[in-house]
Amino acid sequence: GIVLYHRDYREDDKLVKIFTEQAGKLMFFVKHANRSRLNSMIQPLTLADMYLKINDDGLSYIEDIHEVQSFQGINQDLFRLSYATYILALADASIQDRQPDPALFAFLEQTLQLMDRGLDYEILTNIFEMQILSRFGVALNVHECCVCHRVGLPFDFSFRLGGVLCPDHYDRDERRAHWNPNALYLLDRFQAVKFSELETISIHDEMKTELRKCLDQLYDEYVGIHLKAKKFIDSLGSWGEILRNEKNCSRCNGWRSRSTGPSRRGQSSHTRI
């Protein structure tokens, strides 16, 4: 199972939401949690083998936990942690409790593993957002023109048609989105990419901004959920950049003390897809 979140219950107990591979999402009761040996193992973003007592009605119970992985790479970085928390919340919102979904469980685990390894957390989140849309009952066509079915053209998106239009058929929707065709090309790639085939990611910051705009509009139009975790990562755009600059400045100062070469701060951040 993967621990999604926990909250205090009464004075010393906790309710722990766990996404299990076999039984879906369930709420578990942990008595005297702060004094329990399980306390360190029921933190959010914990992956483990769990022995669980699952009741048909009411709360279930954790009997034992083994083989714990706590995603240290994620937990030690505010930005990765924020995005990982968002995809946990997105997975939680996408299916009903007690609804087994081994495919979603595996997809969530793969996303977290790659994020923990240091792959681009923003793009991994974008891929997760695109591929989880089907769990919300949303099926978008970003691969071929909705009218003539041609592929590989500078498409634009039509909210009315739920898909893309080629230049010859832009006139089918006067209120088309006017999105960057390269962003739509990437969204099409994201919709079909398999993590087993993903080795590196390379997308520049300007395109990441375009992708974020497109996905926000898609979720506002077709999904309509407003998660606290999403609001938090949106706020990273303002004060988070200050933290990044301070961190980079600290690294650059240390680097300059060993060399008289140029500063590295001007380099753009990107990885390769």
Question: Which residues are covered by each model-predicted region?
Answer:
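Non-catalytic alpha-helical scaffolds and adjoining flexible linkers that form interface surfaces
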Residues: G1-K14, F19-W255, R265, R272-I273
